[in-house]
Amino acid sequence: MAKRKNKKVDDVAIDTRGRILEAARNLLLKRSGGEVSMAEIAKEAGVSRQAVYLHFADRGSLFVALVKYVDEKRGLQEVLDTIRNAPTGIAALRAMAAAQSRTNPDVWPLARASEAIRRTDEAMEKAWQNRLQDRHSGCKAIVKRLAKEGSLREGLPVDVAADLLWTITSIRTWEDLVLERKRKRSEYEEYVSEVLLRVLTSQP
């Protein structure tokens, strides 16, 4: 009986946590990554501020959890698997540009908010740096594959190529091209893919 009761309590806690994270995500999307307070998140989730703080000690810990939550919602693992399982390194480059084009509209508001929070929150800064490093490692894996297949541009060091791939496909580049310069999603994908192939590969 006690186990059943504890399970119900756990289920309620998980449900409340999910509602809080979904509320935070929705508010960030509505405000394009603008400032969102814990009180506003509580109101959006239909819970008290106290309930929010029971699950998340502060705004930094909430946003660290939110990053993981959004990754799960957008199927990040499937996105990464598509890139890794591409038939060639060149196909992986194209898949990466396509993935950035498709997922960045949802990621950008959270990235914008996280970048502001990380400057004053140690946990958020650590999560941010880990994320950057993970993405760079993925870029380097693609470049190594290009080199192994003989597709990497002659004379281009692997480390330099990885840095270029990491930078060209960064969310900041996407922001500049799509949000600032008003390029369409299809244009971003097409032109970024072409730049990557011309800069990184020996393909004519």
What are these regions (language model features)?
Residues 1-15:
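N-terminal intrinsically disordered/low-complexity leader segments
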Residues 13-24, 41, 66-70, 74, ...:
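Generic hydrophobic, amphipathic alpha-helix propensity
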Residues 19, 27-61, 65:
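Helix-turn-helix
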Residues 56, 116-121:
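Short helix-capping/turn signature of helix-turn-helix
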Residues 102-113, 123-149, 159-163, 194-201:
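Amphipathic alpha-helical packing segments from all-alpha helical-bundle domains
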